[in-house]
Amino acid sequence: MTIMVEDIMKLLCSLSGERKMKAAVKHSGKGALVTGAMAFVGGLVGGPPGLAVGGAVGGLLGAWMTSGQFKPVPQILMELPPAEQQRLFNEAAAIIRHLEWTDAVQLTALVMGSEALQQQLLAMLVNYVTKELRAEIQYDD
């Protein structure tokens, strides 16, 4: 049996798509910088009250700048460079090594029939996205 990277990538896309997983690289540094800068300017212009107003306005602006930057995990997976897809493939292949399949459709059906395999693959995927990509996971309901 030839194990294909593409089959496993399609499987991981199906799993993460079914769970409506999204990920965003954290931009908290950007938000903190904007908040701090606005508080500083507010303090220079208006003294202590200006500091409070500048901090509040900066916090809102920073939150607005960093919101809505989540992308679907399947999209992120398909945009990964081949070397990263190979890393994911190696980790997933270790989990599903006992399965035999001929194509991505059959592989997906086999995994979807096993809650244990789904959980193992999802845990591996969440670990990869949070640690390697330094992204935050969000689930849409």
From Swiss-Prot:
Q: Give me the segments passing through the membrane.
A: 40-60
- Give the coiled coil ranges: none
- Main location (coarse class): mitochondrion
Induction note: Up-regulated during adipocyte differentiation in an in vitro preadipocyte differentiation model.
Query: Can you name the source organism?
Result: Homo sapiens
Biological-process GO terms, alphabetical: apoptotic process; autophagy; mitochondrial calcium ion homeostasis; response to oxidative stress
Illness association: Neurodegeneration with brain iron accumulation 4: A neurodegenerative disorder associated with iron accumulation in the brain, primarily in the basal ganglia. NBIA4 results in speech difficulty, extrapyramidal signs, oromandibular and generalized dystonia, and parkinsonism. Most patients have progressive involvement of the corticospinal tract, with spasticity, hyperreflexia, and extensor plantar responses. Spastic paraplegia 43, autosomal recessive: A form of spastic paraplegia, a neurodegenerative disorder characterized by a slow, gradual, progressive weakness and spasticity of the lower limbs. Rate of progression and the severity of symptoms are quite variable. Initial symptoms may include difficulty with balance, weakness and stiffness in the legs, muscle spasms, and dragging the toes when walking. In some forms of the disorder, bladder symptoms (such as incontinence) may appear, or the weakness and stiffness may spread to other parts of the body.
Cellular component aspect of the GO annotation: cytosol; endoplasmic reticulum; mitochondrial membrane; mitochondrion
The reported effect of residue 123 to P is: In NBIA4; uncertain significance
Protein name as catalogued: Protein C19orf12
Which effect does the record note for changing residue 58 to R?
A: In NBIA4; impairs subcellular localization to the endoplasmic reticulum or mitochondrion
- Compartments where located: Mitochondrion; Mitochondrion membrane; Endoplasmic reticulum; Cytoplasm, Cytosol
The UniProt family comment states: Belongs to the C19orf12 family.
Identify its membrane topology class: Single-pass membrane protein
Q: What is the lineage of its organism?
A: Eukaryota, Metazoa, Chordata, Craniata, Vertebrata
Sorted alphabetically, the keyword list is: Cytoplasm, Disease variant, Endoplasmic reticulum, Hereditary spastic paraplegia, Membrane, Mitochondrion, Neurodegeneration, Transmembrane, Transmembrane helix
